[in-house]
A protein has these predicted regions:
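Generic beta-sheet signal
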Residues: 4, 144-152
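Loop-to-helix element that buttresses phosphate recognition and phosphoryl-transfer chemistry
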Residues: 4-62, 125-135
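General small-molecule cofactor/ligand-binding pocket signal
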Residues: 5, 72-74, 197
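Active-site metal-binding loops of divalent metal-dependent hydrolases
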Residues: 10, 154, 200-202
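Phosphate-coordination/substrate-recognition cap region in phosphate-metabolizing enzymes
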Residues: 35-109
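Glycine-rich phosphate-binding loop signature in dinucleotide/nucleotide-binding domains
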Residues: 42-45, 141-146
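Acidic, low-complexity terminal tails and accessory targeting/binding regions
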Residues: 78-100, 144-147, 162-217
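Internal catalytic-core helix/loop-beta-alpha segment
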Residues: 109-144
Length: 217
C-alpha cells in the first residue's frame, strides 16, 4: 500500500481567456506556495516531488522552497484542456464560454458531460485517455521509494477523487469547483484500487489573517 500526496498549484492568472494567459502564478499564488512549503518543512520531508510540466505547476513547486528535495516533471500530471473543451462545446452545441464565476459553475458540468460522452472535437484528448494518463502517473510515482508529492491541477485531483469514490459527473463537478489553490490531498494505491484518504487540507491557510488566500483560481 502506497500513499501519495497531491497538491493543487497556487493561484494562477484568473480571468484569462486562454491557456497561455492563465498558465503562470499570480503574486498570491507564489505566496500560497511559500506558506505551504513552510508547513512541509516542519513535518517528515518528502523524498521526491513530481510536478506536471505546466508553468503554474512548476512555479508552485519552486515557490514551496523545498530545495533539498529532488524535483522532476511528468506531463501526465498536466491539467485537462478546459479551454479546448469549452471551445468544442461552443462549436458543437452553441454553448458560449462563461464570463462570470456564476456562469462558470454552470458551465463545468456541461463541459464534463460532453467530454465524458465523447461529444467533443477529434483533436482533443478523450476522457478515457485523460483518466489513463493520470492513473499512469500515479502508478509510476507509487513505484518509487520514499514519500512522494505530486503537484498538479484541479481536473486531475477531482477526477482521481471521483474514480476513488465512484462518483458520477454531477458529483464530480462539485469536487471540481472546490479544489482550493495549494490544497493538499492524499490517495492510497492498493494494487489497482485507488482510495482517497484526504481531500482539500489547507493547514497553511487556516489562520484568520490568511482568509483572503483561500482561492480557487
Amino acid at each position: 500500500m502506497v500513499e501519495l500526496t497531491l497538491i493543487r498549484h497556487g493561484q494562477a492568472q484568473t480571468g484569462a481567456k486562454d491557456e497561455a494567459s492563465y498558465d503562470s502564478l499570480s503574486d498570491l499564488g507564489h505566496q500560497q506556495a511559500r506558506w505551504l512549503g513552510e508547513v512541509f518543512q516542519e513535518v517528515e520531508p518528502f523524498d521526491q516531488i513530481i510536478s506536471g510540466a505546466m508553468t503554474r505547476q512548476i512555479e508552485t513547486t519552486q515557490s514551496m522552497g523545498l530545495t533539498n528535495v529532488p524535483h522532476s516533471t511528468d506531463a501526465r500530471l498536466n491539467e485537462l484542456d478546459y479551454f479546448g473543451l469549452a471551445e468544442s462545446l461552443r462549436v458543437r452545441q452553441g454553448i458560449e464560454v462563461p464570463r462570470s464565476i456564476q456562469a462558470f459553475a454552470l458551465h463545468v458540468p456541461q463541459v464534463l458531460e460532453a467530454w465524458r460522452g465523447g461529444d467533443v472535437t477529434e483533436n482533443l484528448e478523450s476522457y478515457d485517455e485523460f483518466c489513463s494518463r493520470i492513473m499512469g502517473a500515479l502508478h509510476n510515482a507509487a513505484g518509487l521509494d520514499g514519500r512522494i508529492a505530486l503537484v498538479s491541477s484541479t481536473g486531475v485531483i477531482a477526477t482521481l477523487a471521483a474514480i476513488s469514490l465512484g462518483l458520477d459527473t454531477v458529483k464530480k463537478t462539485k469536487l471540481f469547483l472546490r479544489v482550493m489553490n495549494t490544497s493538499v490531498h492524499k490517495f492510497q494505491l492498493v494494487g489497482n484500487d485507488l482510495h482517497m484518504t484526504q481531500f482539500g487540507a489547507i493547514p497553511h491557510l487556516e489562520q484568520a489573517d490568511r482568509a483572503h488566500a483561500r482561492t480557487y483560481g
